[in-house]
């Protein structure tokens, strides 16, 4: 860990890579287009450019070096330990990239007729069948483009279900105060009123608080299991009983499903709907602007309402069909094909026993690291955690140090920072999730470095308040960035496409 001061700070800080527009040179070329063999006459004039596109101009080597340097300024699972809580930043096995690159998948056009895409349809159908087994559900849709999209899909399914039953008076969705922010946002987008379930001091759902807001107006109760505090709801059977007695549906936010693989199935726990984040639990790529995938599983009473189109098997033949009671299409085609194929490869590669080991190692790593950090900072819950845990840096406030300062110091120590200030019910929260992929040596080193940072906060807080000193950008004005964002390079505006 390097925490330097004064002139050393700027000397040791790596430079920021200029934008691609700043290194663009008029006339530079990476490729030479092939001359048209014949005159193009079938493009209407309205689609033809009247002026050049205004693209940056570089040689291929310059472009490669530019983006390679940018990648070296970033941190990812392939370069650093990445304990970003509630995000399950596990390693993505590179062998999985070979599956969507197979010519039978890669060269397939989405408008190919069913006869010409039997292998692709079979792969997606097989993936759905495997997910049904993993989740304990009766039917699956692969259409949602992300976890939050899966949430909205599940909420629309619940709305259609109650409309079909004639229970349109069910206009409320209940969400615990520890939930992901997407839960209330998705509920609102789905046309429901959101009511909050207050947690007990331990972080678990308060049954009295649940009973207080549960009524005949309740359509859905959304629960993240395990919770964002890294706790299993100790009274979940009673929660399920009360929700079902009220005639409502139970939704599981499967963002933390990495703790359950091969151990528990949402359907067996009593949930009616669940989504799973493939980029978390099934090791498909994170971020990059997409594509993503958030498959949704449902019990049989909700299956008729799943989005169209559905892949149907008849003997050895696979067809695409629409269902009359469906909520309709929620996106184009059958989902994010490259992501879904990677997730299928992951399930096939691990098998049932391998999936169980994934969760057991995730639980082991989280509890080992939590035990190593015991007594350093206050934590949430007592006893064992699940796949992640939450610490609070509130005790350091008397020294002028907050969670964000610890996170900045963690960057200087050579890691990606944990999630901070979430869950909202924990002051100065640091949410740490090591995943199953990390070695004991990595966890030991992280624990030692975090311990040194906390001791530094107690003895020399000024040093920590200057961190990070090893990154291109230190401490941007976050308020100004939020209120006056500059999202486009001024040089790009001058060359607007």
Which residues make up each language-model segment?
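Conserved PLP-enzyme active-site core in the AAT-like
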Residues: 119, 149-315, 400-401, 428
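Short, glycine-/Ser/Thr-/acidic-enriched flexible segments
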Residues: 86-89, 94-96, 147, 159, ...
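Non-catalytic terminal extensions of PLP-dependent enzymes
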Residues: 1-139, 264, 314-319, 323-330, ...
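General small-molecule cofactor/ligand-binding pocket signal
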Residues: 141, 195-197, 418
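A generic short alpha-helical patch detector that favors 3-5-residue windows
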Residues: 213, 335-338, 381
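Conserved thiamine diphosphate
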Residues: 157-160, 169-170, 190, 345-349, ...
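A short, small-residue-rich loop immediately preceding and capping a beta-strand
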Residues: 138-144, 172-175
């Amino acid at each position: 860990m390097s925490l330097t001061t004064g002139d050393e700070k700027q000397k040791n800080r790596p430079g920021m890579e200029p934008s691609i527009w700043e290194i663009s040179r008029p006339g530079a070329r990476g490729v030479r287009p092939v001359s048209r063999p014949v005159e193009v006459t079938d493009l209407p004039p309205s689609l033809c450019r009247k002026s050049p596109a205004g693209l940056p101009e570089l040689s291929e080597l310059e472009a490669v070096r530019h983006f390679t340097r940018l990648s070296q300024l970033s941190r990812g699972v392939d370069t650093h330990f990445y304990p970003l809580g509630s995000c399950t930043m596990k390693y993505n096995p590179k062998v999985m990239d070979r599956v969507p690159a197979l010519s039978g998948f890669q060269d397939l056009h989405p408008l190919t007729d069913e006869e010409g895409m039997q292998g692709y349809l079979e792969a997606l159908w097989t993936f759905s069948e495997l997910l049904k087994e993993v989740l304990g559900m009766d039917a699956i849709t692969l259409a949602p483009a992300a976890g939050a999209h899966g949430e909205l899909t599940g909420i629309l399914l619940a709305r259609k279900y109650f409309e079909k039953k004639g229970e349109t008076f069910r206009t409320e969705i209940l969400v615990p105060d520890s939930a992901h922010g997407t839960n209330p946002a998705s509920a609102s987008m789905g046309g429901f009123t959101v009511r909050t379930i207050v947690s007990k001091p331990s972080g678990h759902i308060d049954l009295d608080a649940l009973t207080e807001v549960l009524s005949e107006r309740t359509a859905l109760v959304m629960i993240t299991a395990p919770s964002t505090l890294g706790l299993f709801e100790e009274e979940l059977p009673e929660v399920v009983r009360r929700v079902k007695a009220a005639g409502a549906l139970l939704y599981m936010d499967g963002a933390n499903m990495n703790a359950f693989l091969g151990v528990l199935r949402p359907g067996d726990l009593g949930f009616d709907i669940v989504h799973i984040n493939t980029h978390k639990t099934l090791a498909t790529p994170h971020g990059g602007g997409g594509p993503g995938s958030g498959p949704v599983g449902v019990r049989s009473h909700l299956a008729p309402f799943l989005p169209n189109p559905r892949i149907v098997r008849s003997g050895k033949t696979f067809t695409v069909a629409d269902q009359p009671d469906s909520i309709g299409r929620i996106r184009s085609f059958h989902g994010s094909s490259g992501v879904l194929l990677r997730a299928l490869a992951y399930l096939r590669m691990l098998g049932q026993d391998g999936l169980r080991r994934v969760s057991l190692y995730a639980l082991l790593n989280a509890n080992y690291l939590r035990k190593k950090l015991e007594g350093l900072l206050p934590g949430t819950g007592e006893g064992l955690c699940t796949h992640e845990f939450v610490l609070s840096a509130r005790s350091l406030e008397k020294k002028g140090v907050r969670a964000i300062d610890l996170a900045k110091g963690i960057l200087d120590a050579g890691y990606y920072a944990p999630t901070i200030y979430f869950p909202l019910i924990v002051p100065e929260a640091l949410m740490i999730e090591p995943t199953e992929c990390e070695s004991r040596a990595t966890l030991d080193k992280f624990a030692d470095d975090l311990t040194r940072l906390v001791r530094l906060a107690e003895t020399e807080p000024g040093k920590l308040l200057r961190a990070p000193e090893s990154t291109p950008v230190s401490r941007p004005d976050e308020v100004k960035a939020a209120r006056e964002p500059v999202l486009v390079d001024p040089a790009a505006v001058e060359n607007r496409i």
